[in-house]
Amino acid sequence: MNERLNSPLMFLSVLLYCGAAAGAAGLAAMLFPRQRRRGVALLVTGIALVLIAVCWPVRERRVVDAASRLDRIMPRWQFEERHEIRIAASPDRIYSAIRQVTAGEIRFFQVLTTIRCLGRCRERESILHAPDAKPILDVATGSGFRILADDAPHDLVFGTRVAPRTFAVMNFHVEPDGRLTTETRVFADGDAARRRFALYWRIIRPGSGIIRQSWLEAIKRRAEGKQ
């Protein structure tokens, strides 16, 4: 398994949460007279860390030589995450598992999506409110996502508009040796859209990474017959 944990955007998410925790600890310490000086220091440190995380500039990346369907579909992006896993199964079995895996098989999926939308996504079926027993890709394509490439048993690419002028694309790529990768890319068109999505991404990035890795593990269990 592998994830780009050292990517700047993941680091900024950690910085954001550390700043929020330091600020909260500082406010709590300020309630006690003997701890007020320490509380002020923690609060100032926390605010500084949050401001650094929020204001850090976003760098755009571009594909030079398209090597995959994903490269051709989204050659420019500012936000990304990538995960991979090794599966002891044929590409056909892996691809079938990708299409059939359900939200109920993905550990922490329901908990993290509920936290992500603060309980406000429970009225209609969507990727953030997916039934346990329905294939998660069927839920996605029925609620705003479109299949952009379906090259069985190696490439599946789908995407959606996540906000005005902001587009997300995600893929699953199966190698002949059983290596499965998934990559998410987001392109925000314009400075205002980029700033808005940057804050959102830095907040949800840790939970998103957990979901993506758990999703791959669920595919692995299904493909290897270990559900």
Model region roles, listed by residue range:
Residues 63, 164-209, 219:
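Beta-strand/loop substructures that line and gate deep hydrophobic ligand-binding cavities in soluble
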Residues 89, 160, 184-186:
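Short, structured patches in soluble enzyme cores that scaffold and shape functional sites
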Residues 41-42, 53-137, 142-144:
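Hydrophobic ligand-binding cavity/cleft-lining segments
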Residues 1-3:
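N-terminal hydrophobic targeting signals that begin at the initiator methionine
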Residues 15, 19, 25, 196-227:
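A conserved amphipathic terminal alpha-helix motif
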Residues 21-27, 43-48:
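Hydrophobic alpha-helical topogenic segments used for membrane insertion/localization
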